[in-house]
Regions:
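Conserved alpha-helical substructure of the radical SAM core
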Residues: 1-125, 136-148, 152, 161, ...
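A structure-centric signal for secondary-structure junctions around beta-strands
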Residues: 18, 30, 240-241, 295
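Radical SAM enzyme [4Fe-4S]-AdoMet core and its adjacent flexible, acidic
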Residues: 24, 43-48, 83, 114-277, ...
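Local cysteine-cluster metal-coordination motifs and their immediate loop/turn environment
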Residues: 30-38, 254-257, 295-306
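Glycine-rich, flexible loop segments associated with nucleotide phosphate handling
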Residues: 96-100, 168-171, 296
């Protein structure tokens, strides 16, 4: 059966909840981290307007969102109107339990950032800081980052958190190789009031390097990012496990493994429910199930289905020793 017919004939599903929403308020990033697709795609920086952001959020027709992240592959602190963007979130019909910003901590408009924190809408601030805890390795993995900018951000953001948003969690997420790397980072981060989390390398299609040191094995069939909520029987959250990824122009994309592995629709002109039930998403899923190896991005990705997600998925989870 043709994919368009599948989308038309299938019963319309009205989603009530989203488990994780990634919304790139900025398309692109000023860094060229070696394990990231931006290292080869070299995207130009583009920012969503405040009004377009409002339209897109208004078209997300659900009741509740577990976690809303204002990033996917872009750097949110490059937005020139961050505090205005943040102010749009409480206007929505739905409530987000967690609102997260993840940043490379290299460039900040401190006045606007402070105004964003004053609103106490953001509940989690995450800094990416890969390497073994030395300036040399950090800068090698995340060019053209500067170590001193990272340290300045860690210190100044902590002060602003304490002053304006005491409930804000301060977290770092770091790719490390061994326990010694973890300890070196802890010695830097914990005294500054940050909670470190660690993970291994993921195999991200079109990155400059495959940092995993393992041969890529691409599974057949569709992946966890297209799973139905019923496939998450043992998930601890009681709501619907739906995943939504949005680029800064409103385009809905499949995942957080690549900036644009496909296109499902656009929230500037469509409701989320229409995109979820639409022909573009159905066609993409059908192609994954029938000819994944022939797909330009998904044919280079090792993400498997829910319950058997694969090594890259599990390397992204919190690890400690």
């Amino acid at each position: 059966m043709h994919s368009t017919q599948l989308a038309v004939n299938a019963p319309f599903v009205q989603p009530r909840q989203i488990y994780c929403l990634h919304f790139d308020i900025v398309h692109g990033c000023q860094l060229r981290c070696v394990g990231c697709p931006n290292s080869t795609l070299l995207p130009k920086i583009k920012r969503i307007s405040v009004e377009d952001f409002r339209v897109c959020l208004g078209n997300i027709d659900v009741e509740k969102i577990h976690t809303m992240r204002l990033f996917n592959f872009g750097e949110p602190l490059l937005h020139k109107h961050l505090s205005e963007i943040i102010s749009v979130i409480p206007e929505q019909r739905w409530k987000a339990s967690i609102v997260e910003i993840s940043t490379n901590a290299q460039r900040v408009d401190w006045a606007d950032f402070e105004n964003a924190l004053k609103q106490e809408v953001v509940t989690r601030l995450v800094v990416s800081c890969d390497g073994n805890g030395t300036a040399e390795e950090y800068e090698r993995l995340r060019p053209p980052s500067k170590w001193e900018h990272l340290i300045e951000f860690l210190d100044r953001a902590r002060v602003l958190r304490d002053r304006w948003s005491p409930g804000l969690q301060l977290i770092t997420k770091t790719v490390v190789e061994n326990a010694a790397d973890m300890q070196r980072w802890r010695d830097i981060l914990v005294p500054r009031g940050w909670t470190p989390e660690f993970r291994g390398w993921m195999a991200l299609p079109e990155s400059a390097q495959n940092m995993t040191n393992r041969r890529l094995e691409v599974p057949t069939g569709s992946c966890v990012f297209l799973a139905d909520p019923k496939e998450y029987d043992h998930h601890p959250w009681g709501g619907e496990i739906r995943l939504l990824y949005v680029d800064a122009d409103g385009t809905v994309v499949p995942c957080c493994i690549h900036p644009r592995a496909g296109v499902f629709g656009n929230l500037k002109t469509q409701k989320y429910s229409a995109i979820l039930n639409g022909a573009q998403r159905a066609a993409f899923k059908l192609q994954m199930e029938s000819d994944r190896s022939g797909m330009s991005i998904c044919g280079q990705c090792d993400m498997g289905p829910a319950g058997n997600e694969g090594p890259s998925f599990h390397s992204s989870m919190f690890v400690d020793t």
